[in-house]
Structure formats: C-alpha cells, structure tokens
Amino acid sequence: MGLSDGEWQLVLKIWGKVEADLAGHGQDVLIRLFTAHPETLEKFDKFKNLKTADEMKASEDLKKHGVTVLTALGGILKKKGQHEAEIKPLAQSHATKHKIPVKYLEFISEAIIHVLQNKHSGDFGTDVQGAMSKALELFRNDIAAKYKELGFQG
C-alpha cells in the first residue's frame, strides 16, 4: 500500500503550501472536523464549549492545536512511510491518554482533503488528491496497528 516516489513528491509539494500557513490550515481542518462530526468535540475538553464555526474561529487554543496537529502530521509525511519513530508516541498518547478512535482519524483525514480542495483547488487535482489520500490511509493503518499492539480497540 506504499506510495511511489512520484506520489510522495506530490504529497510533499502540496504539504509545502500547508506549511506556509499552518495556523490557517490547522484551524480550518479542526473547524471542518468539529462541524462535520460534532461527536469528535467530546474528546477535547478545551473545545467542548465551542458550538459554532465563528466561536471556533475566534479560539486561539483551537488555532494552536491545529498547528500542533499539522506539524506532527507534516513530520510524519516527510518520512515517506518510514515513520515508525514518529507514529509510536503518537499512537501511545492517542490510545491511552486521549482515547481517539481510528474512525476519528478517518474524519480528520476527510477534513484535511476537504480543506486542501477548498484552499488549493488549482494544485489539488485527482493525482495529488489520490496521493494524499493514500498517505493519510497509510498513516491511519499504521496508527491502527499500534493501537492493536497497545490493546486499544479504538
């Protein structure tokens, strides 16, 4: 299920656009996640009280968390599938401390794709979208495998 060198190049090229505005992209991804899947808010004590997209947009904590999420994901993507060292602590914290189900990782992957389509439609054609979808699926599958090792049924 790995990606070709060409697919990784597509992923990292579009990710460069994300890194040019981590705060904006991160905020948009989390707002999309929380509005499309409100049940995900229950996992975030800091954000549970945010009920509207406008409230979310005004939250500095949400913006900071968006940067944290996309910074971690960017570090994983740059490893081009050789991300064992990055995945292990992330899976550990998301399984044991935060108890984030794999389904929610699918939801945030959908949110990332949606935001990239909206912000970079000219640079996010079917080839780039397909490569990014594969990269995010690889990430989710590897997190799910670690969850299983940890005995987390997320």
Curated annotation (Swiss-Prot):
GO cellular component: extracellular exosome; sarcoplasm
EC number from the UniProt entry: 1.7.-.-, 1.11.1.-
Phosphothreonine modifications at: T68
Keyword Transit peptide: no
UniProt keyword annotations, A-Z: Cytoplasm, Heme, Iron, Metal-binding, Muscle protein, Oxidoreductase, Oxygen transport, Phosphoprotein, Transport
Keyword check for Transport: yes
Residues the entry annotates as binding heme b: H94
EC supergroup of this enzyme: oxidoreductase
Residues modified to Phosphoserine: S4
Oligomer and partners: Monomeric.
Biological role stated in the UniProt entry: Monomeric heme protein which primary function is to store oxygen and facilitate its diffusion within muscle tissues. Reversibly binds oxygen through a pentacoordinated heme iron and enables its timely and efficient release as needed during periods of heightened demand. Depending on the oxidative conditions of tissues and cells, and in addition to its ability to bind oxygen, it also has a nitrite reductase activity whereby it regulates the production of bioactive nitric oxide.
UniProt similarity note: Belongs to the globin family.
Name of the protein described by the UniProt record: Myoglobin
Lineage of the organism: Eukaryota, Metazoa, Chordata, Craniata, Vertebrata
